[in-house]
Each structure stands twice: as C-alpha cells, then as structure tokens.
C-alpha cells in the first residue's frame, strides 16, 4: 500500500499543490448532501456550480492559510478534519440534519450514554471510508519545502474568485440569503467547527441572569407535578386520534372526563431551547431567572428529578438524577434504567410536604432515539416487531414505528401511575405533561429531531399536552377549555398562578398565558 502511494506521488507536492488538492478532496467526498439540498430547493444546476466554486475557494483558502504557518500543520489539520468530517457526513446523510448553531449546541450537550446510543456498523464504515482512508492518503502524500509567496497569492486569487462569483450571481442573492443557514450547516468542516465556536462563545459571554421581582406565595399547600417528556410527538398518541392503542390508560381517563388535552407546539425542535422556553417568564424579553429558581426564592419547595440532560442555571430545593434516586430504593433494580425510577420518591414527597407548596419537575428520557427500545422495559414492548438498531434507515417502517410506539405505551403507564398517586392525595394536586419537542420517524427521509423549525416537518414540533387535577385542586381552580393552539410558554404562568397570592400578585404574572382560572380568595 505504501509503495503504491510513493509511486503515485513520486514527486513531493508544494504547499500550494497540496492545499488545492486537499480542497478538491474535501469538496468531492463530503458535500453530496449539500448539492442535493441546493438542487432540491432551487431546481437550478447553475446553483450547484456556484456551490462548487464556493467550496473550492473556502476550503482552499483555509488549507493554504494553515500552510503559510506550517506545511505540517496544514497536513495534520486536513487529517483531523477528514476524521471529523466523516462523522459529520454520517449524521447529515443518515438523519438529514443541518449542523447549524442549534444542532451543535445539542452535540455539545450530549452525554456519553447518548453518544453510545448512536454507535452502529454504518457509522464505523463511514469513519473508515470517509475518514481513515482519506486521512491516510493525505498522510502519505509527501510535501516539500516551498516558498510562502505562491500560497499567499493563491489565497488572494481564491478570495477574488469568490467575490467575482458572488457579484456575477447578484440576482440570486435573495435565494442564497434565505437558505444561508441551511447551506452553512452542510459545508464541512466549517459547519461544525464555526458553529461549535459560536455556541462556546455564547456560553462564555452569556449575559448575567437577572432576578425577577419577588412575590408572596399563597398558603394553598398545592402540589404541582410538571412532567417534561422527551421526543414525544402528538401524532402517535391514541388520545389525539392515533389508530393504535398507545395510550389505553389515559384514554380511559379521558373518556371519564379526568383529563384536559391541548393542541400544542414546541418552541423549538431540540431540548435545550425548548426547556428554556418552558421555564422562561418572557419578562421584558430579557435574561431573567427561570421558573424553578424563581419559585425556590419565594419559599416554595422545588424538586427536580431527571433522567435526561439539557438543564442549566437551575437552582432548586433538590436536584437528583434517576440513578441517585434509585440508590435509596431497595429491590428497584428492574426499574433503575427507566423513567419509572423518577417516581420512586413521589409518595413520600406527598406525605412529607402536605402542608407546603411544592413543584416537582420530572424530566423524562421518554422517547429519545435512536435506541427507542432501550427506553422501555421488556414487558412494555407490546408492538412487534420493533427496531433495535441505531441505524434507523435500515429498519422497516413498521418496526421503527413499533419501537417508537412502545415508548408512548410506557409513557402512558407512567402518567397514569402519577395520576393515581395524585388523585389519592389530600392536598390540591395538579399534573401537567408536555413534551420538549416531537420526533421524525422517516417522514420525508427525516429522523430524530433538531431540524430548524422553519423547515421542520410538523412531527418535530406538534406535541402532546395533558393536564390532570384532583378534586381538592378543582375546588380552587378550573382548567380552561380551548381548542386554540398553545405554545410551551404557558407553563411559567400556569404554574406560577397556582402559587400566587392574588391579593399581592407578582408583576411577572401574565393571566393571558395561564391555562387555569383561580378563585381569588
């Protein structure tokens, strides 16, 4: 193998030649999804030609600029980018994602367990074919010492070509401006490198979180359970008309008029942004503290139990991960890996805090892909056959949907169990369940979530929103019945309204965003 490379590249390449060759390799190997997107959206071959010029110029300028510093730096950067590009290329191809700022925020917030869930043979093949092999070729191409003048002039020439090409296509600027963030999310390595830097910079320079004006809570001794689901889409809930019996327990409760359903959409198609929206006050459209922190400061007991990630800047009475909760539970090994572990302490909380105002937030693992079957105990995998592969495109449509529907079936059991505990509670108790966002299961060749909402299919943002109140709660509050679509931003004010003393209400509270009517005694 080595001898073949030495024969082919008998003469060492100059920095200029190598930089342009690397640019050509990158343009050919990793940008088929970009060309498909551009042609699909424009139906113009000339637009693809424009993108070829752009790719050659930007990648060429990148490598030549690195070459001005050091030929070795240029080579090793190309090798590293080859490996990173292969992973990015896999996810773009397999899940139809755009590596924009929001998606890179998701990537940087991904934990080890979620990363392991994406491992597959297909990913390994992509890394070998599009990462290791090109990297090896680049490594074996000999480089020679050469003048810095030629690469510098070439960079100027590439910049000139880029500008000239842009000026020649002024009539198409509006189209490119409209699609810029999607095109940018497909140009490698800039998509992930630039956007990862943007996300990191935003975190570093994040504005200081401001305190909200304090309020005096009432003495209703209410217990609110806010259940935040993961990747649950409304379409697959029998409650909302889905043909398969995915929610038998909740459907019975709905028939008995125990539940209220809302037509809701998520603020975003990824967890971090949706969580911020759910917990945000929208007060003066600025960076103010979120709901759990605000209520905790007011003296309300706030507990956050999580089987998920994405939470940040949360100050509560107690924050526990599911594995921490389960350590206190004897003989709970069977439920330890699953969302049911979050419910272990709920009966104790109801008893111990019966004379206090309490908010319990349960952040579920829910229907998080791609390994849907791992979110469900064996006895809840009722829809068969079900897909158990991380490579969702390799699964049949039936098995993929069955795997997902099993997560909804299990979620039905969890919510019913919560309701059973609350309906027997002495204090006023309310449960609100909503998902952070939806999920794609192969519709329009999309999988998972995270597509920018402006172009995302409805499956990624139409979510279930379910409310239950026990009898003591109904004596003091009523749930508004409406068919008007709502957003996740109603949560802050609906929960705050439960705890407000309306004789001295908070200036933050917005009644128009409250799903409840309160008896203002």
From Swiss-Prot:
A molecular function GO annotation: phosphotransferase activity, for other substituted phosphate groups
Superkingdom classification of source: Bacteria
Pathway: Bacterial outer membrane biogenesis; LPS lipid A biosynthesis
InterPro entries with a match to the protein in the record: Alkaline_phosphatase_core_sf (IPR017850), EptA-like_N (IPR012549), PEA_transferase (IPR040423), Sulfatase_N (IPR000917)
Keywords associated with the record: Cell inner membrane, Cell membrane, Lipid A biosynthesis, Lipid biosynthesis, Lipid metabolism, Lipopolysaccharide biosynthesis, Membrane, Transferase, Transmembrane, Transmembrane helix
Pfam families, alphabetized: EptA_B_N, Sulfatase
Enzyme Commission number: 2.7.-.-
Subcellular location: Cell inner membrane
Protein family per UniProt: Belongs to the phosphoethanolamine transferase family. EptA subfamily.
Any further remark recorded for this protein: In this organism most lipid A is tetraacylated without a phosphate group at the 4'-position and has a phosphoethanolamine residue at the 1-position.
Name under which the protein is recorded: Phosphoethanolamine transferase EptA
Species annotation: Helicobacter pylori (strain ATCC 700392 / 26695)
Lineage: Bacteria, Pseudomonadati, Campylobacterota, Epsilonproteobacteria, Campylobacterales
């Amino acid at each position: 193998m080595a001898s073949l490379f030495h024969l082919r590249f008998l003469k060492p390449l100059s920095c200029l030649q190598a930089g342009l060759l690397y640019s050509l390799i990158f343009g050919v190997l990793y940008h088929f999804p970009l060309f498909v997107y551009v042609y699909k959206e424009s139906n113009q071959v000339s637009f693809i030609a424009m993108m070829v010029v752009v790719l050659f110029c930007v990648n060429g300028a990148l490598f030549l600029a690195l070459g001005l510093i050091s030929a070795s730096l240029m080579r090793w950067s190309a090798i590293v980018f080859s490996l990173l590009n292969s992973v990015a290329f896999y996810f773009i191809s397999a899940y139809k994602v755009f590596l924009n700022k929001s998606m890179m925020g998701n990537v940087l917030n991904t934990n080890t367990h979620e990363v392991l869930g994406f491992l597959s043979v297909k990913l390994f093949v992509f890394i070998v074919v599009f990462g290791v092999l090109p990297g090896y070729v680049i490594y074996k191409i000999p480089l020679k010492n050469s003048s810095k003048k030629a690469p510098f002039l070439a960079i100027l020439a590439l910049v000139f070509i880029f500008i000239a090409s842009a000026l020649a296509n002024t009539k198409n600027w509006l189209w490119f401006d409209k699609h810029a963030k999607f095109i940018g999310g497909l140009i490698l390595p800039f998509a992930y490198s630039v956007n990862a830097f943007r996300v990191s910079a935003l975190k570093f320079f994040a504005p200081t979180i401001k305190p909200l004006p304090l309020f005096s809570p009432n003495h209703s001794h209410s217990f609110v359970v806010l259940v935040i689901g993961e990747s649950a889409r409304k379409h697959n809930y029998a409650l909302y008309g889905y043909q398969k019996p995915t929610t038998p327990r909740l459907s019975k409760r709905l028939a008995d008029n125990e539940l209220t359903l809302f037509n809701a959409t998520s603020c975003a198609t990824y967890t971090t942004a949706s969580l911020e929206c759910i917990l945000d006050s929208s007060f003066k459209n600025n960076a103010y503290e979120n709901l759990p922190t605000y209520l905790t400061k007011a003296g309300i007991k706030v507990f956050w139990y999580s089987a998920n990630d994405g939470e940040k800047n949360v100050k509560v009475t107690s924050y526990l991960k599911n594995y921490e909760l389960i350590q206190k539970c004897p003989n709970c090994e069977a439920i330890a890996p699953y969302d049911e572990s979050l419910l272990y302490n709920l009966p104790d909380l109801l008893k111990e805090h019966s004379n206090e105002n309490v908010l319990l937030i349960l952040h579920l693992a829910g229907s998080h892909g791609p390994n849907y079957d791992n979110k469900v105990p064996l006895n809840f995998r009722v829809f068969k056959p079900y897909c158990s592969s991380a490579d969702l495109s390799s699964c049949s449509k039936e098995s993929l949907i069955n795997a997902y529907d099993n997560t909804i079936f299990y979620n039905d059991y969890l919510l019913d169990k919560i309701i059973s505990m609350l309906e027997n509670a002495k204090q006023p108790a309310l449960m609100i369940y909503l998902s952070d966002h939806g999920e794609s299961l192969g519709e329009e060749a999309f999988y998972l979530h995270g597509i920018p909402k402006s172009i995302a299919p409805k499956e990624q943002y139409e979510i279930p929103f379910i409310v239950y109140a026990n009898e003591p709660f109904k004596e003091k509050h009523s749930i508004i019945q409406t068919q008007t679509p709502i957003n996740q931003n109603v949560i802050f004010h609906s929960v705050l309204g439960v705890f407000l003393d309306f004789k001295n209400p908070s200036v933050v509270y917005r009644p128009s965003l409250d799903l409840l009517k309160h008896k203002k005694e």
